[in-house]
């Protein structure tokens, strides 16, 4: 498994591009802010997005979803509990095609991921476990736990 980290937007949100070395397709996790720039970098690596996976629905994690999905047609996954977040926190209505929840297993682009529902930062926050790597969104911050004081 190959993992590339892009720090995007003014909050320097961690966006991850993950792929199986044997596959041309990849997954994008939390494409905040700059969809065009993220997609340009993915293409520089010779990859094609097979799906967008969201750890939660806040604007700094979903900002690039619409443009990437519109250009590639790839599906977008989010936990259903985040569909009712305040639009002020989500940059408008969240674009998605599928919902997932606790215990769901995904097989995308030669990668197997397990969804772990971790509410607190948002009602629908999830962590995504792929092999021995956990993508935690804002459930964890560097050196501390994530914030739980935000509305929604």
Which positions does each model-derived feature cover?
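Metallo-beta-lactamase
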Residues: 92, 112-117, 122-152
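Short, basic and Ser/Thr-rich N-terminal targeting/leader segments
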Residues: 11-12, 109, 122
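Conserved beta-strand hairpin/beta-sheet module of binuclear metal-dependent hydrolase folds
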Residues: 1-45, 126-137, 142
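Residue-level signal for pocket-adjacent positions within structured domains
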Residues: 1, 6, 81, 95, ...
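Active-site HxH/HxHxD metal-binding segment of metal-dependent hydrolases
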Residues: 23-26, 33-112
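Conserved S/T- and glycine-rich ATP-binding loop of Class I adenylate-forming
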Residues: 18, 55, 118
């Amino acid at each position: 498994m190959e993992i590339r980290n892009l720090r995007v937007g003014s909050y320097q949100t961690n966006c991850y591009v993950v792929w199986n070395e044997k596959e041309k397709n990849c997954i994008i996790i939390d494409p905040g802010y700059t969809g065009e720039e993220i997609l340009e970098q993915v293409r520089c690596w010779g990859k094609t997005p097979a799906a967008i996976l969201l750890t939660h629905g806040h604007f700094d994690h979903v900002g690039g979803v619409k443009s990437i999905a519109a250009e590639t047609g790839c599906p977008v996954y989010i936990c259903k509990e985040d569909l009712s977040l305040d639009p002020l926190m989500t940059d408008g209505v969240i674009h998605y095609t599928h919902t997932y929840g606790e215990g769901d297993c995904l097989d995308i682009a030669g990668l197997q991921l397990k969804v772990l529902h971790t509410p607190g930062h948002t009602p629908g926050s999830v962590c995504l476990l792929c092999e021995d790597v956990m993508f935690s969104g804002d459930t964890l911050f560097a050196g501390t736990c994530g914030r739980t004081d935000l509305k929604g």
